[in-house]
Regions:
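Conserved small/polar residues in nucleotide/adenosyl-binding loops
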Residues: 398-405
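Short glycine/acidic-enriched loop and turn motifs that connect beta-strands
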Residues: 58-59, 107, 150-154, 243-245, ...
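Surface-exposed loop and turn segments in beta-propeller and other repeat-based domains
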Residues: 15-31, 261-279
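Conserved Ser/Thr-centered positions that define the repeating blades of beta-propeller domains
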Residues: 4-5, 61, 108-111, 162-164, ...
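Loop/turn-rich, solvent-exposed surfaces of beta-rich toroidal or solenoidal domains
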Residues: 36-45, 294-295, 302-304, 321-360
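Conserved blade-ending motifs and adjacent loop-strand segments that build the rim/top face
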Residues: 79-87, 128-129, 322-331, 366-384
Length: 409
């Protein structure tokens, strides 16, 4: 970037004499303030005032003439609370941070206060571009693990990192399963003793030493999403909702066994390459299995075209919930005061009506928590706050995770 004051006869580089950045309004921009510059404008009424755009937002200065004195130009971020993002994953712990997010381009954040910028900035060591998976050990809440793709050039950095203080500080794993391992999904045993990572288009890999070594999980197909039981650290689960197959492990993820399910998903969509597109957005929360916080082997399958629940201890006997017709996103939240079962949140069609819904009685009844004016476009995920009943977070395409307080609904 150059500046001229004589009609283009001579030019002075703006950044060669030094510069200062004020990141205070958006600390996450510190990782890469200058990139994707598309435009610069000088205030026609004030030659000291200029602005330029980047992929992380707009920057502004009021001392542009410092270049002439060979002094630093000070730039301040303009994007206070406004940013185009794609949230890819949400994790709400029972203690500590209210929410830990995985986001496209910016990596992700540990949110202690959703009303203010995260003072820690985006997750570091390493910085991810995309964080496709983030979760934690339910019985060891300080342990959180994330997987994604690296941001920029970070020699020797790994695409998996973990925190042992609830997302404040991060440690890179020593190794990855293969040279190309990145993105995908991560599952962490309830006590944190074992992790299962399924990188993009890859087999599932198990580590029991925080990524120092890896082994292939036996009995799983490639590219399938695995979750951990929230109580028993030996149990992991995965589901292929369209093929009606449940995979389960009782040895900490080393071996999985397949069980045939009797679901009622639309058979016309099976075996068709285009079916995945018609079954909602692949980045969304449908056609997944979920484990209920605080309850062993209490499982939900949020299929695109139906909701199924199993609490049978001896076998996996899923029953369909007859009111739910379509699901785009599904999640849990803190139980209503006086209840012992977590609140359930769902985005989809119930009783013929599209909306955002909450159930306080294990999906026997539902309350709509939005209205026709507040639909928000494409919503990929929904996640209840596990520390405050009635607060819920939704992932909107091209926005940050959006909190909504709906306890009075």
């Amino acid at each position: 970037m150059f500046r001229t004051t004589d009609g283009g006869k001579s030019w002075k580089p703006i950044f060669k004499t030094g510069y200062e950045y004020d990141y205070s309004k958006a600390p996450y921009t510190k990782v890469a303030p200058l990139h994707w510059m598309f435009d610069i404008e000088i205030d026609p009424t004030d030659a000291e005032h200029a602005m330029f755009t980047t992929g992380f937002g707009g920057w502004e200065t009021f001392n542009l003439s410092a270049v002439e004195r060979e002094e630093p130009v000070k730039w301040s971020i303009m994007s206070a609370g406004i940013e185009e993002t794609v949230p890819l994953e949400l994790y709400a712990p029972e203690k500590g941070a209210r929410l830990i997010s995985g986001i496209g381009d910016y990596g992700g954040f540990t949110h202690f206060d959703l009303n203010r910028p995260d003072s820690l900035g985006s997750h570091a060591n390493p910085h991810f571009g995309n964080t496709n998976g983030v979760t934690g050990a339910w019985l060891k809440q300080d342990l959180v693990v994330r997987v994604g793709t690296l941001f920029g050039h970070q020699p020797d950095a790994k695409t998996i990192s973990y925190s042992e203080d609830g997302g404040r500080h991060w440690t890179m794993c020593a190794t990855v399963p293969t040279e190309k391992s990145r993105n995908g999904h991560i599952a962490v045993a309830a006590d944190g003793s074992s992790w299962i990572w399924i990188p993009d288009r890859s087999k599932a890999y198990l580590t029991r030493d925080k990524g120092a070594s890896w082994q292939v999980c036996r009995g799983l197909p490639k590219n399938i999403r695995v979750i951990a039981d929230k109580v028993n650290p030996k149990r992991f689960y995965a589901v292929d909702a369209v093929a009606e197959i449940l995979y389960s492990s009782e040895d900490g993820g080393a071996t999985f066994h397949a069980d045939t399910l009797n679901l009622t998903v639309k058979r016309s969509q099976r075996g068709n390459a285009g079916a995945a597109v018609r079954r909602g957005d692949l980045r969304g929360g449908q056609d997944r299995i979920y484990a209920t916080p605080g309850r062993e082997k209490d499982l939900w399958i949020a299929a695109y075209d139906g909701l199924y629940h199993s609490v049978t201890s001896e076998k996996f006997d899923f029953r369909v919930l007859d009111k739910v017709r379509t699901i785009y996103a599904f999640g849990f939240g803190k139980a209503k005061p006086g209840n012992d079962y977590p609140a359930i949140y769902l985005i989809g069609v119930i009783n013929g009506q599209y909306g955002f819904f909450r159930s306080d009685d294990a999906a026997n009844s539902w309350v709509r928590i939005n209205d026709d004016v507040h639909q928000y476009g494409l919503v990929l995920h929904i996640c209840g706050d596990m520390q405050e009943y009635g607060r819920v977070y939704i992932c909107l395409l091209y926005t940050s995770p959006s909190p909504r307080d709906i306890s009075g609904s």
